[in-house]
Amino acid sequence: IIRHLNQRSEMLSGISHDLRTPLTRMKLQLAFVKDEKISEKLSNDITEMEKMLNEYLNFSSSRSVEKTETFDLSELLETTVQKYEKNKITTDIPERVYLDGRKNLIQRCLNNLIDNSIKYSEKILISLKKSASNITITVDDDGPGIPENERENVFKPFYKIDKSRGDSKSSVGLGLSIASDIVRSHGGNILLETSPKDGLRVKIFLPF
């Protein structure tokens, strides 16, 4: 699994680098587009593509240099949640749950999951549990959810779902893919289910 993740990361990182030059050319060509509506749409598309590339390049860079450390996952979760709208998110997080891992990558994973839920829902519940064999992080929301037949697809890089969790809102198409890669690089697993709120439930299992 680790070898597969490394190969995929190297491939996507290479693609991301290769796409930067044509994107820069496209931005320069926008100056010659006279139709403002077309120019604005193209500019938005280019900006979204740049977000995709930058997010994956940042992930690849962090993954290659960050060392494993023991950190307080409970504290990291609480600190991460505080950056978002408090009226949207409730938590069920016990104190002092420790994890051996790459802290910045785990935070990026959490940010991606919360960002995804916030786009499509009004209420989010984040819970943390520790058992004898693993740590479980659960993110429940009340959004439109993801159809069961699409749940494996959303972990594919650049995959975007039509209609359900909306193509009406911008999505970098890499958030869940990167989250999945981070979890699996820690020897864990990530599953998508229907939440008790009839939205999406994301469950992360991490060994410790």
Regions found by a protein language model. Name each.
Residues 146-158:
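Short conserved segment of the HATPase_c
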Residues 63-66, 98-101:
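Conserved micro-motifs of the catalytic ATP-binding
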Residues 141:
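Acidic ATP/Mg2+-coordinating residue in the GHKL
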Residues 90-100, 129-132:
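Conserved catalytic submotifs in the C-terminal HATPase_c
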Residues 187-188:
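Conserved glycine-rich
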Residues 106-107:
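A residue-level detector for a conserved hydrophobic packing site
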Residues 175, 179:
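Short alpha-helical Gxxx[C/S/T] motif in the catalytic ATP-binding
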